[in-house]
A protein has these predicted regions:
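Short, low-complexity, Pro/Ser/Thr/Gly-rich segments in the mature regions of secreted, periplasmic
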Residues: 316-372
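C-terminal/domain-edge helix-coil "capping" segments
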Residues: 1-44, 154-267, 347, 351-372
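Short acidic, glycine/serine/threonine-rich helix-capping segments at coil-helix boundaries
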Residues: 265-273, 280-298, 302-326
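Acidic helix-start/capping segments at beta-turn-to-alpha-helix junctions
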Residues: 51-56, 88-104, 248-254, 292-296, ...
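Stable alpha-helical elements in mature extracytoplasmic
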Residues: 28-32, 68, 72, 76, ...
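N-terminal segment of the mature soluble domain
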Residues: 43-128, 161-165, 171-178
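Second-shell loop/turn segments in exported
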Residues: 57-67, 152-153, 211-219, 262-268, ...
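Sec-exported extracytoplasmic/periplasmic mature domains
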Residues: 55, 77-85, 230-242, 280, ...
C-alpha cells in the first residue's frame, strides 16, 4: 500500500497541466485582430464563411494509413474566430436551422461577405532525406576463448512536405476574388537515431539496443499551416499589412499594389484627408479637413522626422512614395519586442561568426618546434 501511494505521488508530480495550443501564427492572428481595430476602426464587421476544407491527396484514407487529417474545416474556423471582433465567422448548418424552425425557433440569418474554399493539395512523403551509419567490432582472445565486441550507430533524417491552398469567393456574386488566395507549404521532420551494442563470449552473446525517434506531428504542422494561410487571406482581403504580425515578415506585393491603385484613384484632397486619418493613428492631434493646414504640416514634420528621416523634409502627401510608409508603419505594441528579438538574433549570429573565425585562425596557425 505504501509503495502504491509513493508511486502515485511520483506520477502526480510529473503530471503536466493543460497548455494553450498556440504557435507563432496563432499569436499573429491575435495581433492581426488588434491591427484591424487600428486600421479599420470605422469599417463594418467582415463576415466570413467557409466551405468544407478536405484532403484532396486521399492520404487521409485508412487504406493509405490515415497519415493526415481528412477534414481541416474546424481548424479554419478556429483560426478565423481567433482574430477578433472585426472578423466574424458565420457557421453553415442548414439541417440544424431547419430543425429548429420546425420546433418554432425564430432567429435571424447573417449572410457572409466572403466564402473561403480550399483543400490540402500536397503531401510529399520523404521529400528529402539523409542518413549515416557507423559500425565497429573487435575480436580478441583467439585460442584462449573468443570474445567479440560490437557497436552500431545509425542516424536518419527525412523531410516531408504538406501544402494547403485557400481561395476567397465573393458571396454576393459567387465569383472568386482575383489574386485573393494563399498557397503555403510546411516541411515536417522525421528523425530516427538508433544505437546497438553487443558482447559475446564463446559464441554466446548478450547486448542492448537503444532507439530514439523524433517526428514532428503532422496534425500540429497542418494547424500551423492553416493559421498562416488564414492570416494571409484575411490580410489580403482587408488590405492590412499582416506581415508585420510575425518577426521578419516581408510586405505582400498584392496588398501593396491594391493600396497603391486605390490611393492613386483618389483626388488630391481625399489623399490629404486619408493622410490626416493616418496621422491620427500616430497620436497626432489633427482634424480631417482634406486641407494641408498648419496643424497637419506640423504633424507631418514631426512624424516623418521621427519615423522616416530618409525621405527628407519636403513631404508631399499626395504622392504614393511619401504616403506608403505612413500607411504601412503605424506603430504597434509588439514592434519593440520584434526589434529586441532581431537585435538578439543579430548579436548571436555575430558571436557565432567570430567564434568560427577564431577557430579557423587557430587551426591555420603554424606549429613551431623548439630544439632542446
Amino acid at each position: 500500500m505504501r509503495d502504491a501511494q509513493k508511486q502515485l505521488a511520483t506520477y502526480q508530480e510529473l503530471r503536466e497541466l493543460p497548455q494553450a495550443n498556440l504557435n507563432l501564427y496563432s499569436q499573429a492572428l491575435q495581433r492581426l485582430g488588434y491591427m484591424l481595430n487600428v486600421y479599420k476602426s470605422g469599417d463594418p464587421v467582415l463576415y466570413v464563411q467557409s466551405r468544407t476544407i478536405l484532403d484532396s491527396t486521399n492520404l487521409s484514407s485508412p487504406l493509405a494509413g490515415a497519415e493526415i487529417p481528412g477534414d481541416v474545416t474546424e481548424m479554419v474556423r478556429t483560426a478565423l474566430n481567433r482574430i477578433g471582433a472585426k472578423v466574424v465567422y458565420v457557421p453553415y448548418h442548414p439541417d440544424y436551422l431547419v430543425a429548429q424552425a420546425q420546433l418554432g425557433g425564430q432567429f435571424g440569418v447573417t449572410m457572409p461577405d466572403y466564402l473561403i474554399t480550399g483543400a490540402l493539395t500536397e503531401f510529399d512523403r520523404a521529400l528529402s532525406g539523409a542518413g549515416r551509419a557507423n559500425n565497429a567490432s573487435v575480436e580478441f582472445g583467439k585460442g584462449h576463448g573468443s570474445t567479440t565486441l560490437g557497436y552500431n550507430a545509425t542516424n536518419v533524417a527525412i523531410y516531408s512536405a504538406l501544402a494547403l491552398d485557400l481561395n476567397v469567393v465573393n458571396f454576393q456574386t459567387q465569383q472568386m476574388v482575383p489574386r485573393m488566395q494563399s498557397s503555403n507549404v510546411v516541411k515536417v521532420l522525421d528523425m530516427t537515431s538508433e544505437r546497438n551494442a553487443s558482447l559475446g563470449f564463446y559464441g554466446d552473446a548478450f547486448g542492448f539496443k537503444t532507439e530514439g525517434k523524433y517526428m514532428q506531428g503532422r496534425h500540429s504542422a497542418i494547424r500551423t499551416l492553416v493559421d498562416l494561410s488564414v492570416l494571409e487571406i484575411v490580410g489580403k482581403v482587408t488590405n492590412t499589412p499582416y506581415w508585420r504580425t510575425i518577426p521578419n515578415g516581408h510586405p505582400d506585393p498584392v496588398v501593396v499594389e491594391n493600396m497603391r491603385n486605390a490611393f492613386e484613384a483618389l483626388s488630391p484632397q481625399v489623399r490629404i484627408g486619408l493622410a490626416q486619418v493616418m496621422l491620427q493613428k500616430y497620436q497626432q492631434p489633427v482634424q480631417v479637413t482634406q486641407q494641408l493646414d498648419a496643424p497637419t504640416a506640423q504633424a507631418v514634420a514631426q512624424v516623418y522626422a521621427a519615423h522616416f528621416p530618409q525621405l527628407g523634409a519636403q513631404i508631399d502627401l499626395t504622392r504614393w512614395e511619401h504616403f506608403e510608409p505612413l500607411f504601412f508603419n503605424v506603430p504597434m505594441p509588439w514592434d519593440e519586442e520584434f526589434k529586441r528579438e532581431a537585435a538578439q538574433a543579430q548579436e548571436a549570429a555575430q558571436r557565432q561568426a567570430e567564434e568560427a573565425a577564431q577557430r579557423a585562425r587557430t587551426q591555420a596557425a603554424p606549429v613551431r618546434y623548439e630544439e632542446g
